[in-house]
């Protein structure tokens, strides 16, 4: 079956490395903060001006003045820094973020990403995504494999206005973990209980399927 939002966050958290500075985008990416491997030193950055963001707060820990870029209440780790958004974006544009995790509407086989606008619908604005895709070389996109209408979000070419071009190399969906190389998606892992055939059927862009595609593993709850 398809991964839950929490399982997607758990899988992305496995891509963290000790000493990383990581920016988490709005939506599913924010959940990753709850699944950083124990004992690993990772500094989470929020573009509204927080370095050292912690997990989501318990009810007793909620501080309405401590929020992330998505206006969600968060915690701050010991040693965290709070600063202006100008300084925050200087970190991003200067290439000081080791890993960025973003949501998206579409990704294509050339590594293009569309994440900010659907024509005819309310547009909130670009946010920090354009700076992040330009300033970070290591980006993971997390999104559902298909839209609510069943249309694939993994395309030969993005149909929506782009956020960035040729910048995405890894995608985690609720069905699969894929890499992008040489104009194709490469299937690396599949969600537990999801068949390769289902992933093929729901991927519009060119898809390379190895002889063996392992299932993702999750600890029993």
Where in the sequence are the language-model features?
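N-terminal active-site beta-alpha-beta segment that forms phosphate/nucleotide-binding
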Residues: 1-77
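Conserved phosphate- and dinucleotide-binding cores of soluble alpha/beta proteins
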Residues: 3-7, 58-221
């Amino acid at each position: 079956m398809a991964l839950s939002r929490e399982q997607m966050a758990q899988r992305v958290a496995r891509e963290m490395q000790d000493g990383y500075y990581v920016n988490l985008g709005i939506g599913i990416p924010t959940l990753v903060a709850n699944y950083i491997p124990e004992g690993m030193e990772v500094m989470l950055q929020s573009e509204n001006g927080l370095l050292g963001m912690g997990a989501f707060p318990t009810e007793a820990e909620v501080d309405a003045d401590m929020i992330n870029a998505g206006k969600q209440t968060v915690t701050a780790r010991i040693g965290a820094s709070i600063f202006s958004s100008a300084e925050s974006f200087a970190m991003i544009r200067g290439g000081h973020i080791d890993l960025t995790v973003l949501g998206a509407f579409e990704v294509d086989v050339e590594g293009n990403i569309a994440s900010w606008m659907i024509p005819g619908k309310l547009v909130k604005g670009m946010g920090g995504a354009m700076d992040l895709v330009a300033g970070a070389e290591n980006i993971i996109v997390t999104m559902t494999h298909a839209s609510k209408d069943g249309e694939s979000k993994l395309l030969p070419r993005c149909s929506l206005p782009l956020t960035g071009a040729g910048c995405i190399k890894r995608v985690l969906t609720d069905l699969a973990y894929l890499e992008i190389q040489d104009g194709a998606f490469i299937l690396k892992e599949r969600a537990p209980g999801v068949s390769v055939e289902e992933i093929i059927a729901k991927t519009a862009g060119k898809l390379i399927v190895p002889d063996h595609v392992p299932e993702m593993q999750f600890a029993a709850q």
